[in-house]
Amino acid sequence: VGFKAGVKDYKLTYYTPDYETKDTDILAAFRVTPQPGVPPEEAGAAVAAESSTGTWTTVWTDGLTSLDRYKGRCYHIESVAGEENQYIAYVAYPLDLFEEGSVTNMFTSIVGNVFGFKALRALRLEDLRIPPAYCKTFQGPPHGIQVERDKLNKYGRPLLGCTIKPKLGLSAKNYGRAVYECLRGGLDFTKDDENVNSQPFMRWRDRFLFCAEAIYKAQDETGEIKGHYLNATAGTCEEMIKRAVFARELGVPIIMHDYLTGGFTANTSLAHYCRDNGLLLHIHRAMHAVIDRQKNHGIHFRVLAKALRMSGGDHIHSGTVVGKLEGERDITLGFVDLLRDDYIEKDRARGIYFSQDWVSLPGVLPVASGGIHVWHMPALTEIFGDDSVLQFGGGTLGHPWGNAPGAVANRVALEACVQARNEGRDLAREGNEIIRRAGKWSPELAAACEVWKEIKFEF
């Protein structure tokens, strides 16, 4: 037999500190917490091995391939400041390990097996560098930011949305009525909640019809283009595409998908359909916190956001920095830039471990949603800038006078903030004053200001 049987240390093969990374490599930064007694080099090498070519023992079929050409390599390890026994392990994967245009295959390879590994107490994928050669195998977002603005004819400000509540239990006609009132009041979009699919109290086809009616009625009355994110997520891909086809036949501008529960394969198929048929695609990240909330185990959301840009979506929820859900400001802004910009420099302060060049893949609009109201408007305008969607669910429907006045209040607040910013005023310092002054001319906004109290915001 021409090979030496038996178990050998991973680090002998997979820890290569002298390796020069190639432009075509996919690079990963893992936060590794080894079990007591396991050296960090062995833990990092184990991750590289188990997520590429390795298995636990030497096998004779290793001799039939060129391991050097195909193996993942742990090329650098650094300890995490302020954390005991935590390391960042950098791993380089040769491009040939991955199927072109498949986020599913990329994740199956990189995170598929290694997270249950005994030598590790915990493991978190913090960032990925997707090389241009691999980016180019993806279609990416169906349309992107510029095309969306042109389709909607809306420029120079963030877009406004609202999730229809209560999310479950309304009949289709009442649901459509709520949509109409919000759009009529001045919002650009309304939204199906992520778990509104096709339940007994409201089947999808009825909802699509009544929402389309609401959209057209509001468009006629306001002279603006309106949309409602019709959730096409379904139990099978075929059913999902059937719903997308019906939305296209109704002539509505945008549909929606839950990309993590629906899965990357379904999402990429839907994104291709949307580009071919002129539909915008709104993406909800339901289930993300299961994967990304633990600080030392799982996958950071910036990786899920990059994966979505590759798989395809025109909007994605990205946290608010100011509302009811968790999100640290610099880190959030880091992945907001990763969604929108063509080229992003490495910036460890914002959690960006690698420079990322998207080579002409269209951008994705970040959606701020969750516990926000009119007093947050100056902060949101300042933090997210024009290329974003600000979504006020309770902050619209919770208005004491109803949905349409709630929508008016949000639109007036937004226009006031954009105007103040364009005049060179400091939204951080004068935010509350700007909202108060706008409220003098808008009873709807004044009423909203009463219900939700001013916030102290430092930014």
Swiss-Prot record:
Lipid metabolism keyword on record = no
Q: How is it modified after translation?
A: The disulfide bond which can form in the large chain dimeric partners within the hexadecamer appears to be associated with oxidative stress and protein turnover.
Known cofactor(s):
Mg(2+)
Q: Where does the chain bind Mg(2+)?
A: K191, D193, E194
Q: Which residues cross the membrane?
A: none
Instruction: List the PROSITE patterns hit by this protein, alphabetically.
Output: RUBISCO_LARGE (PS00157)
Q: Which Gene3D superfamilies match?
A: Ribulose bisphosphate carboxylase, large subunit, C-terminal domain, RuBisCO large subunit, N-terminal domain
The residues annotated as site (Transition state stabilizer) are K324
Q: Where is the active site?
A: K165 (proton acceptor), H284 (proton acceptor)
Q: Where in the cell is it found?
A: Plastid, Chloroplast
One example of the protein's molecular function in GO is: ribulose-bisphosphate carboxylase activity
Question: N6,N6,N6-trimethyllysine is carried by which residues?
Answer: K4
Q: Which UniProt keywords apply?
A: Calvin cycle, Carbon dioxide fixation, Chloroplast, Disulfide bond, Lyase, Magnesium, Metal-binding, Methylation, Monooxygenase, Oxidoreductase, Photorespiration, Photosynthesis, Plastid
> Residues that bind substrate, according to the entry?
N113, T163, K167, R285, H317, S369
Q: What does this protein do?
A: RuBisCO catalyzes two reactions: the carboxylation of D-ribulose 1,5-bisphosphate, the primary event in carbon dioxide fixation, as well as the oxidative fragmentation of the pentose substrate in the photorespiration process. Both reactions occur simultaneously and in competition at the same active site.
Q: Which family does it belong to?
A: Belongs to the RuBisCO large chain family. Type I subfamily.
Miscellaneous remark of the record: The basic functional RuBisCO is composed of a large chain homodimer in a 'head-to-tail' conformation. In form I RuBisCO this homodimer is arranged in a barrel-like tetramer with the small subunits forming a tetrameric 'cap' on each end of the 'barrel'.
Q: How does it assemble?
A: Heterohexadecamer of 8 large chains and 8 small chains; disulfide-linked. The disulfide link is formed within the large subunit homodimers.
Name the chain's protein.
Answer: Ribulose bisphosphate carboxylase large chain
